[in-house]
């Protein structure tokens, strides 16, 4: 009914660009989280800590994990605030939202077989409905939808927890760590599952695309 794209290639490039840019932002957020307030003791003063303890610990953790950890510039801030982790959670949420949009677009384009758009064909990973022949359930798309809902909730929890530390010390780190770990795990696993069980087997319904194109009002 409206202007069309030049083909599915344009659609796929747009989707790939969304995820690629989201990954870049996640990597920047992860880098910020590698700055540690280690050696600040309870509130950031570093009282009763040996000189050089912070850099020594960061060097050890870097060697053990192969991740470049460093001492933060203001230990008072990172002991009281969890903004870097809140930012990482938000970037994970944004990436999950992009994946959610892609899944919904694919689900609608694959709807059918008779009354839907039907321009894409999803792989039949499991039996469809016994009373609706030809129907393919978009289970992988729905899995992405549910993961996005969970990550939205985790992000709200993390941001709430990050603002509820009293004075110099934030005691909400356990729920922040638990929630962000769940978000990372879910996003990683659903991305792999969606790729293997939906995207890799996705096919264009060329006949239906031509039919819809031939009936488009844009041809007037």
Question: What are these language model-derived features?
Answer:
Residues 10, 14-17, 24:
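Structural preference for solvent-exposed beta-strand-turn elements
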Residues 19, 26, 85-88, 92-95, ...:
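Amphipathic alpha-helical coiled-coil segments
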Residues 1-8, 12:
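Single conserved hydrophobic/aromatic residue that forms the stacking wall/gate
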Residues 24-37:
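Glycine-rich phosphate/diphosphate-binding loop of Rossmann-like nucleotide-binding domains
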Residues 9, 46-47, 133:
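Glycine-rich tight-turn/loop motif centered on a GG-T
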Residues 43-125:
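Acidic, glycine-rich loop-and-beta core segments that form the ion-binding/anion-interacting portion
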């Amino acid at each position: 009914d409206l202007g069309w794209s030049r083909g599915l290639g344009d659609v796929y490039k747009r989707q790939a660009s969304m995820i690629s840019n989201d990954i870049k932002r996640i990597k920047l957020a992860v880098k910020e989280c590698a700055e540690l307030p280690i050696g600040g003791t309870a509130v950031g003063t570093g009282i009763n800590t040996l000189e050089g303890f912070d850099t020594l610990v960061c060097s050890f953790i870097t060697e053990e994990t192969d991740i470049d950890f460093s001492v933060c510039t203001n230990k008072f801030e990172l002991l009281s605030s969890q903004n870097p982790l809140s930012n990482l959670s938000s970037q994970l949420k944004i990436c999950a939202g992009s994946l959610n949009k892609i899944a919904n677009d694919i689900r609608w384009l694959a709807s059918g077989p008779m009354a839907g758009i039907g321009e894409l064909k999803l792989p039949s990973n499991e039996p469809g409905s016994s009373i609706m022949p030809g129907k393919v359930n978009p289970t992988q798309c729905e899995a992405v939808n549910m993961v996005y809902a969970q990550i939205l909730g985790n992000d709200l929890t993390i941001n709430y927890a990050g603002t509820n530390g009293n004075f110099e010390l934030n005691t909400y780190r356990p729920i922040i760590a638990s929630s962000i770990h769940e978000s990372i795990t879910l996003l990683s696993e659903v991305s792999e599952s969606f790729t293997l069980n939906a995207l890799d087997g996705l096919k264009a319904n060329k006949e239906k695309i031509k039919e819809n194109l031939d009936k488009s009002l844009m041809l007037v």
